[in-house]
Regions:
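C-terminal, beta-rich DNA-binding module of retroviral/retroelements integrases
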Residues: 119-223
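RNase H-like DDE/DDD metal-dependent nuclease/strand-transfer catalytic core used by mobile genetic elements
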Residues: 2-106, 110-112, 117, 209, ...
Length: 223
């Protein structure tokens, strides 16, 4: 993962999973396909409604189809996506609140102009004074084909990562599927790796210790 900022956005008629998946396709067609895509735990990204943990949605399916590992941050820890939150603040205060839009098409047009200006001229301390375009000039690679379309079913390949903090109740919640660990494994961050093809899940500590292995049923139907 990188803490460098290079912006590409999509203006959507709504934030439901299918439009979000399509927006990812549009963005990755511009900036290239990443190895990992990090999301919060909102159902629009994850798909499905708890406790039906077996179902993921179009965003996750698109990641798996392109060989991207979807990684979900710990619950109620938005700072894990701090770079995104920082850009959202810049976008909101420097653009969205300062303009009046007559339609969604108008917003899209003005948003495209803002993004081009932002990437060419906005400077962040994390870039040591460089602009996003300067930072990413030689980093953008593996562009997505313009003809790509998001899948309509969950593919059985790669994996899904879910980061969680184990509290004193010894409980790990994976979108409705509960896992209980021993008391000596509490008060630490772990990563649950859902192996899509084998429909298994393993839970690993930061030290690389496997503290749980079990089944994780998955449905090919997207929700």
């Amino acid at each position: 993962m990188s803490d460098h900022i290079w912006s590409a956005t999509a203006s959507l008629p709504n934030s439901r999973p299918p439009p979000l998946a399509s927006s990812l396709v549009g963005i990755w067609s511009t900036v290239g396909v990443p190895k990992v895509a990090q999301f919060d735990n909102h159902a629009n990204f994850r798909g499905g409604i708890q406790p039906v943990y077996q179902h993921f949605g179009p965003v996750v399916a698109t990641c798996l189809d392109l060989g991207v590992t979807p990684r979900f941050i710990p619950v109620a820890e938005p700072w894990r996506n701090g770079v995104i939150e920082h850009f959202n603040d810049v976008w909101d205060k420097s653009f969205f609140r300062n303009e009046t839009f007559t339609s969604l098409d108008h917003l899209r047009t003005e948003n495209t102009a803002f993004i081009e200006f932002h990437n060419a001229y906005h400077r962040y301390s994390a870039h040591e004074g460089a602009t996003p375009d300067q930072m990413w000039k030689y980093r953008l690679c593996k562009p997505l084909s313009a003809g790509y379309r998001p899948p309509t079913r969950l593919l059985t390949q790669t994996r899904i990562e879910v980061v969680r903090y184990i509290r004193s109740n010894r409980h790990i919640d994976l979108f409705g599927k509960g896992i209980t660990v021993t008391e000596d494994q509490t008060h630490q961050y772990v990563t649950a790796i859902i192996k899509v093809r084998s429909k298994k899940v393993i839970v690993i500590t930061l030290d690389g210790e496997i503290i749980h292995q079990g089944d994780f049923n998955l449905s090919p139907v997207l929700r």
